[in-house]
Amino acid sequence: MTRKIKLTRANKSILLNGLAPYYYQEKALGHNTENPGRLILKINALPADKKATFSTEEIRLMRITINRLRNERLGKGQYTDAADDLLLKLF
């Protein structure tokens, strides 16, 4: 199943900030990084403010990484408004 999601410039930035540490962590642990790598390239290639189609697996991966980023920022006492907005789009 796929869903169309509109990504703003801020959404793209937050997604890439969340996916990059996940990618490097998985790579350091020796796990398969094909799916996160492909998703990073897909998001980076998208024009801002356009709808894009994402698979269920891609959406799950985005939710996990954005939630990790949000929790990390909450722990540091930083704002999480952009991450919260994106999480709402992904549910």
Predicted segments, located by residue:
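Positively charged, low-complexity terminal tracts
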Residues: 1-91
